[in-house]
Amino acid sequence: MISHNDPKFLFVHLPKNAGSSVTKVLANYIGVDREELRPQKYKFIYARDIPKVLDNKQDDYFIFSVVRNPWERTVSYFHYLQQIRQPPHNLDKNVKFSNWVRAGGHRGLQTQMSQLADKFPCSVSTHIDYIARLERLGEEWPKVCEKMGIQCDMMHDKKSKHQNYSDYYDQFTKDIIYKFYKNDVDCLNYEFNKE
C-alpha cells in the first residue's frame, strides 16, 4: 500500500502487479523517496481495512489497484523467487516451473480477490474506485493520473524478462493455477491465452 495526502490517493498494492513501478512513478512525481509513501505497518492491506487505514476518510481519497492475469502473475512470481537471495524465499535456478507448481510453490502468492473483496468473494470492495489491468496499464495509467489530477508517465521497474506465460504450462499445471486462483479468473474476467 502507498498513500499520500496531496494528491489524496491510496494504492492497494497486490504483489507481482506492477506495484514497484507504480510506487516509483508516484514517488518521483511527488518528489519523495518511495519508502516515504510505503508505511511499514500497512505494506500490504486488504480492502476491508481501508477505512481503518484512512481514519474513515476514504471518500476523500482516490483508491486504486492493479490486477494481472493469474497465470502470468504466477510465472512472474516464479522468476522473482529465482532472483532473490533471501532464504527461505529464494528458489534454486534449476527448479522447473512445472515441478514448482505441482509442489504448490504458487501458494505463496495469495489471490488478488482476497485483498480486493469486501464481504463477498467475487465482489470488489466499494472502497476501491478504480482497478487497472496490468495488461493494459499503458492505456489505463493516464486515466488513473487524471482521476488523481496529476500527469506523469508510467515506467516499468523490476520487469522480469521471460517468454510468454502460456509457454510455461501444460494442461495439468494450467488447471492447478485455475483451481487455486478461480476467484481471480472468474471475478476479474481472465482467461488463459496462447498469444
Predicted regions and their residues:
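Membrane-interface amphipathic segments in extracytoplasmic regions
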Residues: 1-195
